[in-house]
Amino acid sequence: MAGYRKLGRPTDQRKAMLRNLVTSFLKHGKIETTETRAKETRSLAEKMITLAKRGDLHARRQVLAFVTEEEVVKNLFDNIAPKYAERNGGYTRMYKVGPRRGDGAEVVILELV
């Protein structure tokens, strides 16, 4: 079945977690998280970057509706999006770090290319 991963949470918690992960990712340029969370975060972050490349007011408002910090949105539109002006998708890279010590979950580093 196509769509999205449930990540073992109710819808509102999952959306809040992914919004926070995307905001942190765009703020810092990289995050360390589990592989499944990173795959969902990657998908949403790439959509935000593609919107930012459009650069119009409507795109800015759409990004503001998802990303939780205005400074991150400003940085996304002013610095990150112009860097990828010539690139069509594939703005992120994932590195496997290995299993997490506590529960053995596969951990990855997600970063901007």
UniProtKB/Swiss-Prot annotation:
According to its UniProt entry, the protein's GO biological process terms are: translation
- Record key words, sorted: Ribonucleoprotein, Ribosomal protein
Please describe the quaternary structure of this protein.
Part of the 50S ribosomal subunit. Contacts protein L32.
Q: Which InterPro entries match?
A: Ribosomal_bL17, Ribosomal_bL17_CS, Ribosomal_bL17_sf
- Give the protein family: Belongs to the bacterial ribosomal protein bL17 family.
Identify the SUPFAM superfamilies for this entry.
Answer: Prokaryotic ribosomal protein L17
Gene Ontology CC annotations of this record: cytosolic large ribosomal subunit
GO terms (molecular function) for this protein are: structural constituent of ribosome
Q: Provide the gene name from the record.
A: rplQ
Q: Which HAMAP family match?
A: Ribosomal_bL17
Please give the organism: Clostridium perfringens (strain 13 / Type A)
A Pfam family annotated for this UniProt entry:
Ribosomal_L17
Superkingdom of the organism of origin: Bacteria
Membrane-spanning ranges:
none
Q: Know the name of this protein?
A: Large ribosomal subunit protein bL17
